[in-house]
Amino acid sequence: MIKNYLTSLKQEFSGYNTAKLMKDIMAGLTVCAVALPLALAFGVSSGATAAAGLVTAIIAGVVIAVLGGASFQISGPTGAMSAVLVGIVASYGLQGVFFACFAAGALLLLAGIFKLGRLISFIPMPVIMGFTSGIAIIIAMGQIDNFFGTASEGSSNLAKIASYTRLGFHPNLQAVLIGLLVVVVMIVWPKKWGARVPGSLVGIILATVVSALFRMDSIATVGDIPRTLMLADRLDLGSLNLDMLKNLISPIVTIAALGMIESLLCGASASRMKNEPFNADQELIAQGVGNILLPLFGGVPATAAIARTSVAVKSGQQTRLASVFHSVFLLASMFLLGSVMARLPLAALAGVLMVTAWRMNDWGGIRYIFSHKLKSGISQFLITMLATVIFDLTVAILLGVAYSAILYIAKSSQIGVSFSDIDANKLRTVEGKPPVLETTGVVYVTGSLFFGAVDEFNRRMAEMPAYDHVIFSLRGMPNIDVSGAQAVLELCESLQKQGKTVACCGMADGVRTYFDRTGITVLLGENAYFWNAEDAILDLLSAEIAE
């Protein structure tokens, strides 16, 4: 693994020169402009602080990039992760988040070491779309107070919204105007300009200037930005204990699962953009190490972010140094512009997050499944989205995957069975119509024969005509499991007890292996297997003549 990493690193920097260095520096600067407002916003929306989001972006941008599985990944705090963290902060405080981040990092590290990166391929796309949309809803719900300048109570977003019925909903007009200003700027900002100066950055600068000029003192601001990478609120290793671990098992798994999903999806997408290889397992190792280190500095969990990564690629990024430079520029901003960032209105950051939440949705994919009326895809999407909003990400993914598995089993259990008499006229090597063919039939089986299809298989076999000689054509049966093999064995035993002969033809290698292991081959004999039905019929005729 280390050898492969060093080899890929050597290839990445082969022919590196001043021109490529300048491209990495400029790409890093551009990504910094995108990452700065997002880091501040996601830090606040996670229930931590803007400084925590900034530290996360700086540390992750260096550590995860250097150890990562590709040259193009840019990691940091994300909207999806912040939506998960806000509930953990409400229940367990910042120390709970730091501990969960540390433990989730260890899980990601182990996942990379044991090469579990391919697990992401088992999550259906509608499920991923569903939890992404669910997270977008959670982000938007979590910013209602900051955007409208209201106050709510509750440990979850749903509880906070419900509290408005008791506390009342009294928007602060100044906060709403600042939030709307940012939203409008982000929407109307030209894409060609956004490639260099993102609309989110322009929006929060304008919002800060407007709030200062018009003395909008009633609006809450970001507050103090410490000029240090070692925040006062950080993981206290002395506080780690088994009881905390037991309480945080679900959040730990949630953070690790989200880190894996976001990072690997981002890597796969950017890999296609750059036409470069992506080592999923190495990326998980990098994400693990990064998330183990982050809470020691006071950072929150990080993942690879598609928004920042795509900006880097489009800005001419050459190597992973672009991510390092983005962190350097963020660090410079922290030390040089900390006093300015402290005055940023929370309503402005809420505006950024509202637009970000809207853009998070895979609108192309959503339109596709609804416009084509793909009922299974729509149900997978809706179930996962609602579960994400009502429960949490871990439950949502488990529900989505379990529901998808049930749909697959239901569809796969529709096994096809048909019966066909022998038409001697279609047999090229047979003249006339031998009497034995009148009591011979071919049974065609199509579809995988596994536990979900056994009942239908048995029901159809009970309708088999009274053949004396049965030939099973299994060319359309690609797979079989133990339950299916047991059903075939019992059927063959029953037919033989009735004095009937049984032959099989057109078996896939995997099906033949199961027949060998489950005793079907011993029961029927090796001479009962043929390449096609005609060969089986000719063998039957030969045996008839010999008698």
Describe the role of every protein-language-model region.
Residues 231, 359-523, 541-544:
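The feature marks cytosolic C-terminal regulatory regions of anion transporters and related permeases
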Residues 1-2, 537-547:
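Intrinsically disordered or compositionally simple regulatory linkers and C-terminal tails
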Residues 328, 511-512, 531:
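Short secondary-structure capping/turn micro-motifs that flank functional sites
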Residues 135, 474, 531:
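Residues that line or immediately flank small-molecule/substrate-binding pockets and catalytic motifs
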Residues 524-539:
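Short acidic-hydrophobic, aromatic-tinged amphipathic segments that line or gate anion-handling sites
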Residues 1-423, 487, 519:
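Transmembrane helical cores of multi-pass ion-transport proteins
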Residues 75, 504-505, 530:
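Active-site-adjacent beta-strand anchor residues
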